[in-house]
Amino acid sequence: MEELYQRFIASAGICTDTRKIVPNSIYFALKGASFDGNAFAAEALNKGATLAVIDNPAYQIDERTLLVPNVLLALQELANYHRRTLKTLIIGITGSNGKTTTKELIKSVLSEAMQVVATEGNLNNAIGVPLTL
């Protein structure tokens, strides 16, 4: 994880969508119900990503692809590793209803006095939270 973290620190950020690749970013090949992000690893690298994190060896191209057992888990572990380096207050919100509204209200109030980072919209899930971190 340390090696991936050092590459993350030196990168322009993380991307999971090849349509939004920026130069020097790291592409995480997430899978969805109707797509396999591994299939887009070469495209991500061609568009300027410096690293593609994949979990299918069939898509391993060269040293610019990092093969991991599970891409989503690698993204979550990277976010957790990064979070542990931060010296900041973290607020978690749980419940069945109203989490996004509560998050937006807290963000609005706290941003009057301090710098605030929060997930966009309702991306309060296994992908949105790591991407926010």
Predicted region positions:
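N-terminal leader/targeting and accessory segments in enzymes
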Residues: 1-77, 81
